[in-house]
Amino acid sequence: MPEYVNWLRHASPYINAHRDCTFVVMLPGDGVAHPNFGNIVHDLVLLHSLGVRLVLVHGSRPQIESRLAQRGITPRYHRDMRITDTETLECVIDAVGQLRISIEARLSMDMAASPMQGSRLRVTSGNVVTARPIGVLEGIDYQHTGEVRRVDRKGINRLLDERHIVLLSPLGYSPTGEIFNLACEDVATRAAIDLAADKLLLFGAETGLLDEQGRLVRELRPQQVPAHLQRLGGNYQAELLDAAAEACRGGVARSHIVSYAEDGALLTELFTRDGGGTLVAQEQFELVREAAIEDVGGLMDLITPLEEQGILVRRSREVLEREITQFSVVEREGLIIACAALYPIADSESGELACLAVNPEYRHGGRGDELLERIENRARALGIKTLFVLTTRTAHWFRERGFEPSSVDRLPSARASLYNFQRNSKIFEKAI
């Protein structure tokens, strides 16, 4: 079977979920200048064709720097914000204007090679961002540098309803006709909040947020962000992370940080279960909970391969339905990726931990330990003092977690009578 067939099958729930959703996408000036920009444009057009309501916010910092260099003007910054005097503002207007036109042209040019071939893709921009001056901070007059006051929510939604892609530049206008240079991150964050967007997607040079060992941090809650900001200092990843958290605190369900240098990063983030970047979200991305009858199908998908390998005892659908209240599960984006069951043993203060299973793709994230802790807590609440486990293949895993070798003679009679000598499982016990 071709690989793309399998990919489409896995992506189909996301295609359906994203239809008619509002996404605000922020692409910094470095991203527009990157060789992968053409692929990003194509992916944006694909999203539009799938029914996503798109607001694209572009940056322009390197393009402004180039204009300043051409005129021999030295850039001035304070706290990583540009001080925009009159001469600098002229360069900003020039760079932003040319870049906006270039993006519009690129979106139009890619139509022949996009899913929108044969239809009219409309890109619209305008004076929908109202701004105000930052003013004087710490004795520094920022002059024409501003901050977003509001975006025209009704106007933008009207355009999105009419199937326009809305393009926002890092310029804002005051009611008195002044022009202000804005940070594209600020524009994107405020647009996402004011539009009650479903997602804010932030492009950066890196794959996403990396930890101290250089590993990708896939998910974060807004309350976890400050610790990472302190570690990152004042680099651009910190700016993106701060913007993502601010959007979530403002009501945006999910914010994503992805790489503009990686071909397909946007689609990977949106149409695969684990994505390819960093997700910041208020709600729990992965949930440990008690199983419900609706989980039986997912449980069977998880444990059947392990039953076929002889690792787990076979359980029919009827058995699972009857014993579903004994199970705890780990759910990730609607998929059951791990499970465990607790069976109290009659006429004893003992219980059996059974059917502990983790999807092979998720076996290195501590989910087995998480389920074990949940089962132990549940057992204590039921007055169980000794937990037994029978296993044929994972003895060392349980030994490392405090289980001691045991025997059939140690099992309560109600469980010992059911012991399968042909299977010859090793028995372990743990006082809890």
UniProtKB/Swiss-Prot annotation:
Domain N-acetyltransferase per the UniProt entry, residue ranges: 286-425
One BP annotation, GO: L-arginine biosynthetic process
Main localisation: cytoplasm
Record Gene3D superfamilies: 3.40.630.30, Acetylglutamate kinase-like (3.40.1160.10)
Keyword annotations from UniProtKB, A to Z: Acyltransferase, Amino-acid biosynthesis, Arginine biosynthesis, Cytoplasm, Transferase
UniProt subcellular location: Cytoplasm
The enzyme's E.C. designation: 2.3.1.1
GO CC annotations, alphabetized: cytoplasm
Keyword Acyltransferase applies: yes
Catalyses which reaction(s): L-glutamate + acetyl-CoA = N-acetyl-L-glutamate + CoA + H(+)
Protein's pathway: Amino-acid biosynthesis; L-arginine biosynthesis; N(2)-acetyl-L-ornithine from L-glutamate: step 1/4
GO MF: L-glutamate N-acetyltransferase activity
Classification via Pfam families: AA_kinase (PF00696), Acetyltransf_7 (PF13508)
Record-linked InterPro entries: AceGlu_kinase-like_sf, Acyl_CoA_acyltransferase, Asp/Glu/Uridylate_kinase, GNAT_dom, NAGS_kin, NH2A_AcTrfase
Similarity section: Belongs to the acetyltransferase family. ArgA subfamily.
HAMAP family: N_acetyl_glu_synth (MF_01105)
Protein known as: Amino-acid acetyltransferase
Naturally occurring in which organism (per UniProt): Pseudomonas syringae pv. tomato (strain ATCC BAA-871 / DC3000)
